[in-house]
């Protein structure tokens, strides 16, 4: 290994899972592990085998399937934990036992009820036992960020003597600041005589929002492994986010000179989405690197700059993490340059329309609708569509019966005619979708469906967003109601109306 390679140790399946309301299934964990292997993660911490039979089996299955990443299991500094970790890991091509014990005064006295000498003895015994199973042993000083520095140095020195090849320095409660954490690592390298015999790792939590900053500050002082999770999942406020620290190393080569990882960055976005879907943990829209707004531009000034040179407002190319679609949002803040570019992308010559006229009508629509899509812009050009009330399909009545055979009955007004259909589905939402498809005689494919609470309490409103694909083009719909089925029906109707208007535009083009 070259000195400046940063080992990426992913603990999504262990520390990340601890943040979830319920445990993941074995096959779900395997799916994530295989995605992490494909991403290029060096070490995958697959779980804590002694904690449950389910975790043991998950670690065992992952160990048997993953070939290119080292599989790691966590254990306390107890013989039974270490033995159980080995039993789960022994089928792996490459495996690591990760044992830990708390070293801060607070944890030793109030949690473990032991003094430093007892803790030191337990740590050495655990490392020696783990070494009887493998040369790849990692030792963590839990709550290192609040451990007296002389004690920490002595513990690290003795852990290395006992045979630990990786020493992990966790900021367990996210307490330290970057300069402070960097100084801890610096002191370790200056005071621990055998520090060169082990790789120094860091595991930073995000309680004060410093996890990524602390991790990066540590590698500047000699740390060469970063422990992190996809999307920053983890206890309380989470862990250092893999996507953030990896892209920071890749993007700021001017400052983080010579450092690199083996992560295949083009797989970051799809891995993030996969983990979000499996864990049922939504990604905040403003989340760095992978949030839906991370590469979105709605300000007219920003859009104009990006259209001229993307680097004016983008320090990372979306394609670098595997995003290839356009993230320019058309809102009331968009300027003429954005509208002109969108029309050009749709194939309209600037000599065929009056930009000032189109822009004026666009602003009126954007004020009412919020976000405007390219098909809305085309409708403005051909249909003078400016009002959300100008809909071909309007839901008049809706009823749903749940149970063994979910059934929906939808009554829609199409112009002046009322049409009613009843359909079944795998759930009430699908039943409603099937009704609308039959009434409209349009057969789009549902590509995305999401629900977000827009208020709190028993009368909370939920917003449903859907993406429908029709003839190779995506159409968005939005619905808002205290009833999720009603909100879903509104969202479907909104998207169907967008499809209908696009068909009318095509008719006008052909005329």
Swiss-Prot record:
<dbReference type="InterPro" id="IPR050073">
    <property type="entry name" value="2-IPM_HCS-like"/>
</dbReference>
<keyword id="KW-0479">Metal-binding</keyword>
<keyword id="KW-0100">Branched-chain amino acid biosynthesis</keyword>
<protein>
    <recommendedName>
        <fullName>2-isopropylmalate synthase</fullName>
        <ecNumber>2.3.3.13</ecNumber>
    </recommendedName>
</protein>
<feature type="binding site">
    <location>
        <position position="203"/>
    </location>
    <ligand>
        <name>Mn(2+)</name>
    </ligand>
</feature>
<comment type="function">
    <text>Catalyzes the condensation of the acetyl group of acetyl-CoA with 3-methyl-2-oxobutanoate (2-ketoisovalerate) to form 3-carboxy-3-hydroxy-4-methylpentanoate (2-isopropylmalate).</text>
</comment>
<feature type="binding site">
    <location>
        <position position="239"/>
    </location>
    <ligand>
        <name>Mn(2+)</name>
    </ligand>
</feature>
<feature type="domain" description="Pyruvate carboxyltransferase">
    <location>
        <begin position="6"/>
        <end position="269"/>
    </location>
</feature>
<keyword id="KW-0808">Transferase</keyword>
<feature type="binding site">
    <location>
        <position position="15"/>
    </location>
    <ligand>
        <name>Mn(2+)</name>
    </ligand>
</feature>
<dbReference type="InterPro" id="IPR000891">
    <property type="entry name" value="PYR_CT"/>
</dbReference>
<dbReference type="InterPro" id="IPR013785">
    <property type="entry name" value="Aldolase_TIM"/>
</dbReference>
<keyword id="KW-0432">Leucine biosynthesis</keyword>
<comment type="similarity">
    <text>Belongs to the alpha-IPM synthase/homocitrate synthase family. LeuA type 1 subfamily.</text>
</comment>
<dbReference type="InterPro" id="IPR013709">
    <property type="entry name" value="2-isopropylmalate_synth_dimer"/>
</dbReference>
<dbReference type="Pfam" id="PF00682">
    <property type="entry name" value="HMGL-like"/>
</dbReference>
<dbReference type="GO" id="GO:0003852">
    <property type="term" value="F:2-isopropylmalate synthase activity"/>
</dbReference>
<dbReference type="Pfam" id="PF08502">
    <property type="entry name" value="LeuA_dimer"/>
</dbReference>
<dbReference type="InterPro" id="IPR054691">
    <property type="entry name" value="LeuA/HCS_post-cat"/>
</dbReference>
<dbReference type="Pfam" id="PF22617">
    <property type="entry name" value="HCS_D2"/>
</dbReference>
<keyword id="KW-0028">Amino-acid biosynthesis</keyword>
<keyword id="KW-0963">Cytoplasm</keyword>
<dbReference type="GO" id="GO:0030145">
    <property type="term" value="F:manganese ion binding"/>
</dbReference>
<comment type="subunit">
    <text>Homodimer.</text>
</comment>
<dbReference type="InterPro" id="IPR002034">
    <property type="entry name" value="AIPM/Hcit_synth_CS"/>
</dbReference>
<dbReference type="InterPro" id="IPR005671">
    <property type="entry name" value="LeuA_bact_synth"/>
</dbReference>
<dbReference type="GO" id="GO:0005829">
    <property type="term" value="C:cytosol"/>
</dbReference>
<feature type="binding site">
    <location>
        <position position="205"/>
    </location>
    <ligand>
        <name>Mn(2+)</name>
    </ligand>
</feature>
<keyword id="KW-0464">Manganese</keyword>
<comment type="pathway">
    <text>Amino-acid biosynthesis; L-leucine biosynthesis; L-leucine from 3-methyl-2-oxobutanoate: step 1/4.</text>
</comment>
<dbReference type="InterPro" id="IPR036230">
    <property type="entry name" value="LeuA_allosteric_dom_sf"/>
</dbReference>
<dbReference type="GO" id="GO:0003985">
    <property type="term" value="F:acetyl-CoA C-acetyltransferase activity"/>
</dbReference>
<dbReference type="GO" id="GO:0009098">
    <property type="term" value="P:L-leucine biosynthetic process"/>
</dbReference>
<feature type="region of interest" description="Regulatory domain">
    <location>
        <begin position="394"/>
        <end position="511"/>
    </location>
</feature>
């Amino acid at each position: 290994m070259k000195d400046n390679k940063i080992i990426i140790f992913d603990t999504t399946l262990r520390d990340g899972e601890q943040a979830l309301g319920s445990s993941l299934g074995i096959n779900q964990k395997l799916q994530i592990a295989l995605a992490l292997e494909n991403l290029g993660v060096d070490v995958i911490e697959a779980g804590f085998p002694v904690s449950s039979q389910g975790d043991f089996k998950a670690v065992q299955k992952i160990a048997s399937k993953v070939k290119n990443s080292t599989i790691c299991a966590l254990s306390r500094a107890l013989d039974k934990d270490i033995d159980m970790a080995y039993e789960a890991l022994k089928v792996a091509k490459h495996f690591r036992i990760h044992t830990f014990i708390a070293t801060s005064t607070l944890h030793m006295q109030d949690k473990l009820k032991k003094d430093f000498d007892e803790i030191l003895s337990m740590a050495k015994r655990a490392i020696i036992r783990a070494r009887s199973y493998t040369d790849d042993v990692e030792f963590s000083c839990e709550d290192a960020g609040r451990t007296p520095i002389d004690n920490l140095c002595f513990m690290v020195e003795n852990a290395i003597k006992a045979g630990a090849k990786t020493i992990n320095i966790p900021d367990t409660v996210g307490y330290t600041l970057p300069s402070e954490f960097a100084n801890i690592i610096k002191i370790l390298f200056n005071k621990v005589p055998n520090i060169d015999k082990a790789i120094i790792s860091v595991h930073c939590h995000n309680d004060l929002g410093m996890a990524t900053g602390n991790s990066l500050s540590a590698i500047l002082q000699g740390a060469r492994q970063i422990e992190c999770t996809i999307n920053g999942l983890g206890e309380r406020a989470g862990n250092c986010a893999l996507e953030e620290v990896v892209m920071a190393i890749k993007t700021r080569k001017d400052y983080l000179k010579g450092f690199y990882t083996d992560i295949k960055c083009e797989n970051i976005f799809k891995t993030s989405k996969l983990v979000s879907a499996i864990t049922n943990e939504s990604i905040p829209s403003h989340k760095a690197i992978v949030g839906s707004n991370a590469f979105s531009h709605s300000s007219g000034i920003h859009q104009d700059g990006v259209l001229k040179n993307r680097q004016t407002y983008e320090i990372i190319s979306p394609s670098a993490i595997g995003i290839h679609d356009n993230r320019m949002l058309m809102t009331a803040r968009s300027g003429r340059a954005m509208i002109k570019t969108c029309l050009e992308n749709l194939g309209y010559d600037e000599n065929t329309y009056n930009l000032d006229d189109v822009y004026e009508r666009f602003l009126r629509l954007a004020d009412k609708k919020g976000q405007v899509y390219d098909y809305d812009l085309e409708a403005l050009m051909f249909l003078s569509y400016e009002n959300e009330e100008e809909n071909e399909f309007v839901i008049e009545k809706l009823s749903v019966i749940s149970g063994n055979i979910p059934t929906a009955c939808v009554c829609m007004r199409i112009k002046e005619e009322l049409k009613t259909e009843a359909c079944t589905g795998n759930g009430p939402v699908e039943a409603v979708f099937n009704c609308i498809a039959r009434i409209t005689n349009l057969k789009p494919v549902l590509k995305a469906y999401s629900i977000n609470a827009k208020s709190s309490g028993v009368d909370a409103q939920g917003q449903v967003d859907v993406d429908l694909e029709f003839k190779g083009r995506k159409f968005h719909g939005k619905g808002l109601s205290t009833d999720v089925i009603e909100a879903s029906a509104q969202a479907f109707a909104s998207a169907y109306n967008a499809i209908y208007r696009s068909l009318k535009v095509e008719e006008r083009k052909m005329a």
